[in-house]
Design a protein with these regions (language model features):
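Walker A/P-loop-proximal flanking segment of P-loop NTPase domains
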Residues: 12-134, 140-151, 224-253, 529-534
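The catalytic "switch" region of P-loop NTPases
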Residues: 16, 29-48, 73-77, 114-117, ...
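Amphipathic alpha-helical scaffolding segments
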Residues: 109-116, 125-126, 383-389, 497-500, ...
């Protein structure tokens, strides 16, 4: 019979405590359960090696707390200096790297480096634009196309042009700038990235007009409506224009005068004066004609802009309402995206750069990442090519005081070598800082592991990767194994799995803190096989 202790509440505890008196019989699976409770834990292994947490638990730099807290400013890929360049003279860099090679980590490090540069040189700051969320722009482009093309992702991506990408970059840049001026969220209050109020006050009227015009055209915020943000910015800039209201004032005054005259003429005893009443509608039409002409002219302009601004959703009526707040003299001959060509976009980019220079940002850097993630791309190499290739134009890549950091999947490098002479003459990749293969050597991966272990170590501890293994596993073999895994993500996955498998082999009563070479080799083979299948 089983003895059941009094006061047992949990059914699991009741089951486990129901052991036979005298140990005549004890189910095998319960013995295994007891053994599992005594298995050596990962934390015991880490504590023995003076580690406070597992350095290899995270594989994605976006969520990797060890990287963000300790390694972001001290552990770099060997190609780091070529990619980052000189922040005082922004330049383009093109990186081709496989999944897990560290492109996202490099993006975060670039952002950190630019922030540090801006703190050190407040008069030579760099305006950073993150261009890594393509879904909203591609969705708007898809809706602008004919119905027969909307259902085909290849046709949508094939229709992309350089000016579409420039519109998206201008939208990102203008939206960020307006956010910082209006201080719409806490992230815009970072001193290294904020816009000083005295610099805003020093803008001349032409620059204020340019900023408002860029806002009306490109602002694409999720925190407020376009009209609300435009009005708030106009108030902040103290931009007052009376000329646009003159046609309305003339029309209202003329209407009031016409009503008075019609009453006067109708009361007149003279018959011929009464006939003049019929001329008043023509006079009213003439009085309001100036306003009507201006309304119609701006409405046509708004329609042209909305039609050719394919990566943003714009309402012609709302845009017309904003454009009519500028005088005709201030609006005439200003570049607007009212045709499908890149010249207008370069002129608008230069206007944005001049504004940024006056606000303390003489340089501008755009970081392009995650080109494999948009819904229309879905990780397909051919579609990634259609998305990225329009950006590879030397006129943009070598634009003055402007740099693009393109962090691209390694699959795209295959297409580079097979492109036409015309493509290479347009892109001039020989003039860009190209990292053709974002590879890691075994030694570099070893140093990366060591730095992460030091970041997770107890105070005054100096752990080494070699401390994990038995003496029969040589350092040469360990580095060669790391080389075969090629990327940090694969290495972290391998080491995490290796520690887990090692702990499963031993009980807490008889722990072993050195990993055997046979387990090392077998786990390595499994991880390599899984990587080949992906």
């Amino acid at each position: 019979m089983y003895s059941i202790p009094a006061g047992t509440n949990s059914k699991l505890e009741l089951f486990l405590e129901a052991k036979p008196a005298g140990n005549q019989f004890y189910p095998c699976f319960l013995q295994g359960f007891d053994n599992a409770r005594d298995t050596m834990t990962e934390q015991e292994f880490l504590t023995h090696h003076q580690l406070t947490r597992n350095p290899f638990a995270d594989e994605d730099a976006q969520t990797d707390s060890v990287f963000r807290e300790f390694c972001i400013s001290g552990t770099f890929h060997p190609s780091w200096s070529k990619v980052v360049g000189d922040s005082k003279q922004p330049a383009t860099a093109v990186v081709f790297g496989s999944k897990g090679s560290g492109k996202t980590a490099m993006r975060l490090q670039l952002m950190r480096h630019i922030t540090a540069h801006n703190e050190q040189f407040p008069e030579q700051r760099v305006f950073l634009v993150e261009f890594d969320d393509f879904n909203s722009y591609l969705g708007a482009l898809q809706e602008h196309l004919p119905l027969r093309q909307q259902s085909s992702p290849d046709k949508v991506l094939h229709s992309l042009r350089l000016w579409d990408h420039m519109d998206a970059i201008l939208s990102q840049g203008v939206t960020q700038l307006v956010d910082r001026i209006l201080q719409t969220n806490a992230s815009n209050n970072i001193p290294a990235m904020s816009v000083r109020q005295d610099a805003i006050d020093r803008l001349d009227r032409g620059q204020r007009r340019d900023l408002l015009l860029l806002t009306a055209t490109f602002d694409h915020s999720k925190t407020g409506t376009l009209y609300t943000r435009f009005s708030a910015l106009k108030k902040r800039l103290r931009f007052i224009t009376l000329n646009p209201w003159m046609p309305v004032v003339i029309g209202v005054e003329s209407s009031a005068l016409a009503i008075w005259l019609s009453y006067f003429l109708y009361q007149s005893d003279s018959e011929w004066l009464k006939y003049l009443v019929w001329l008043l509608p023509a006079a009213l039409a003439l009085a309001w004609g100036m306003f009507g002409y201006r309304w119609f002219r701006h409405h046509l302009l708004a329609i042209r802009v909305c039609k050719n601004l394919r990566v943003l959703q714009r309402d012609p009526g709302q845009l017309r309402q904003l454009l009519m707040q500028f005088s005709d003299v201030e609006l005439d001959e200003q570049p607007l995206p009212q045709s499908q060509r890149s010249d207008d976009r370069f002129a608008l980019l230069e206007k944005l750069q001049l504004l940024l220079r006056s606000l303390g940002f003489p340089g501008m850097i755009v970081i392009v990442d995650r080109v494999d993630e948009p819904e229309l791309v879905n990780g397909q190499a051919e579609r990634m090519k259609q998305l990225v290739w329009p950006l590879l134009d030397n006129k943009l890549l070598k634009h003055e005081n402007f740099g693009i950091k393109l962090l691209l999947p390694s699959e795209l490098h295959y297409f580079i070598d097979r492109e036409t002479r015309e493509f290479h003459e347009r892109a001039r990749l020989d003039k860009q800082n190209v990292v053709a293969s974002f590879d890691w050597t075994g030694e570099a991966l070893y140093d990366l592991i060591a730095s992460r272990m030091r970041a997770c170590a107890s105070p005054d501890a100096r752990p080494s990767p070699r401390d994990f293994f038995n003496a029969d596993l040589t350092e040469t073999r360990f580095i060669a194994a790391l080389q075969s895994l090629t990327t940090p993500r694969n290495v972290f996955r391998f080491l995490y799995r290796l520690i887990t498998e090692h702990c499963k082999r031993f009980r807490s009563e008889t722990p072993q803190f050195k990993i055997a070479s046979d387990l090392f080799e077998s786990t390595l083979a499994v991880v390599q096989a899984e990587d080949r299948r992906q």
